[in-house]
UniProtKB/Swiss-Prot annotation:
KW Cell inner membrane (keyword) present: no
Region feature Disordered, mapped onto this chain: 1-41, 314-346
GO biological process terms, semicolon-separated: defense response; defense response to fungus; intracellular protein transport; maintenance of protein location in plasma membrane; negative regulation of defense response; protein localization to plasma membrane; protein targeting to membrane; regulation of stomatal movement
Annotated TM spans: 286-306
InterPro entries noted in UniProt: SNARE (IPR010989), Syntaxin (IPR045242), Syntaxin/epimorphin_CS (IPR006012), Syntaxin_N (IPR006011), T_SNARE_dom (IPR000727)
Cytoplasmic side, ranges: 1-285
Stated name of the protein: Syntaxin-121
Lineage: Eukaryota, Viridiplantae, Streptophyta, Embryophyta, Tracheophyta
Gene: SYP121
Residues exposed to the Vesicular side: 307-346
Keywords: Acetylation, Cell membrane, Coiled coil, Golgi apparatus, Membrane, Protein transport, Transmembrane, Transmembrane helix, Transport
Superkingdom of this protein's organism: Eukaryota
Annotated signal peptide: none
Amino acid sequence: MNDLFSSSFSRFRSGEPSPRRDVAGGGDGVQMANPAGSTGGVNLDKFFEDVESVKEELKELDRLNETLSSCHEQSKTLHNAKAVKDLRSKMDGDVGVALKKAKMIKVKLEALDRANAANRSLPGCGPGSSSDRTRTSVLNGLRKKLMDSMDSFNRLRELISSEYRETVQRRYFTVTGENPDERTLDRLISTGESERFLQKAIQEQGRGRVLDTINEIQERHDAVKDIEKNLRELHQVFLDMAVLVEHQGAQLDDIESHVGRASSFIRGGTDQLQTARVYQKNTRKWTCIAIIILIIIITVVVLAVLKPWNNSSGGGGGGGGGGTTGGSQPNSGTPPNPPQARRLLR
């Protein structure tokens, strides 16, 4: 799951467009702007940078585990005290590095947990939000990975202990001809008396190559004890992670509460979309009103500047003057009025 979140938010950081574009299906919809969401994106960028750092440390732990397993298989073929000692030093170093890395990863995970708690106080990032669920899921996934890695180290520790126990049992049978009981084996391994016992038995029976055999056994015993000690510390880290994972897992598996939170966020998103739609309609209405008012103002200004009614009055006066001038001239083609005709007849 954390890989899925990592890929999705890596795409978010690269600047690809978000699938949530418009409120409505149209291309002229209102784009949702959420400052809190942008802040959450920045916080998630830093969060996933820390997650990638932890993943690199976990990969190094896995590599060390594989190296230790290979060295352990190699130790089964060695029968020289010096070679066993060199291999023991190498394994001790690898176990020490693994222990340091495990503790470092644990500290980083605790820091991420505190960062998640602080992030819940930001607007839009409270408990149950998408940002909080993402952070919690990814962090819990890292804890599980660390727990799996520590579990593999624990299995290696148990394998080394059981095989060393079988080695002591075989050597005891070789010297005495009897199979030791569990109590005797525990005493020989825990107290280190197996080396002294075998040395004494071999010397008494006059077996050859006593010193090399004893030195080899001593080196194997010291290697097992040192490695087991460090691996037990790793096992303690494993137990701590198991408790945290169990606690976080109980929260993540609470399906009912998550469904309730998700439904509340859906209702809130629906309300926000409806509010944005109302704002969109109001914006369009007031835009149309403003355009109409602007057209009226422009029309009034143009009419006030041009004054077309003054030009129309001047043209009418000129026409009347022309009619007067025409009336002063005699018109031979017009017949005289009846009174004038009667005067002419007289």
